[in-house]
Amino acid sequence: MVKPRQRQYPTVTSYLNIVRESLFITISGVFWMYCIVVMIVYIGTLINSQMESVITIRIALNVENTEIYKLFGWMSLFVLIIFIFFTFSLAFQKYKKGRDI
C-alpha cells in the first residue's frame, strides 16, 4: 500500500521573449506619452490657457478651440443621457423587485 504524501504540483516555467516584451513596453510607452500630451492640450484649452506649448501642439494637431468645446459638449450630453438611462433602469429594477416580494 502506498503511503500518503504531499502532492506534487506541476510548476510552470516561462521564458519571456525579450524582443517581444521590449517592443510591447515601447509601444505602450509611446501610447501613454501621446495620451498625456493630448490631455494636456485638452485641459489647457478648456481652462483657456495661453501657454506656448499648448498652442503649438494644438496647431500641430490641427485642432481649434471650438472643436474641443463641441467635443466636450457632445460628451457631456452623452454622459447625461447614459446617467439618466442607468438611473431609471436601477429605479425600475428596485420597484419591480419590491413589487414581487
Curated annotation (Swiss-Prot):
Keywords of the record: Cell membrane, Membrane, Transmembrane, Transmembrane helix
What is the superkingdom listed in this entry's lineage? Bacteria
Consequence of gene disruption: Loss of cell aggregation and PIA production.
Where does the record say this protein resides?
Cell membrane
Recorded GO CC terms = plasma membrane
| InterPro entries in alphabetical order | IcaD
Q: Where are the transmembrane segments?
A: 21-43, 71-93
Q: Provide the topology term for how it sits in the membrane.
A: Multi-pass membrane protein
Presence of keyword Isomerase: no
This chain's function reads: Necessary for the synthesis of poly-beta-1,6-N-acetyl-D-glucosamine (PNAG, also referred to as PIA), a biofilm adhesin polysaccharide. Is required for full IcaA N-acetylglucosaminyltransferase activity.
Family statement: Belongs to the IcaD family.
Protein name per the record = Poly-beta-1,6-N-acetyl-D-glucosamine synthesis protein IcaD
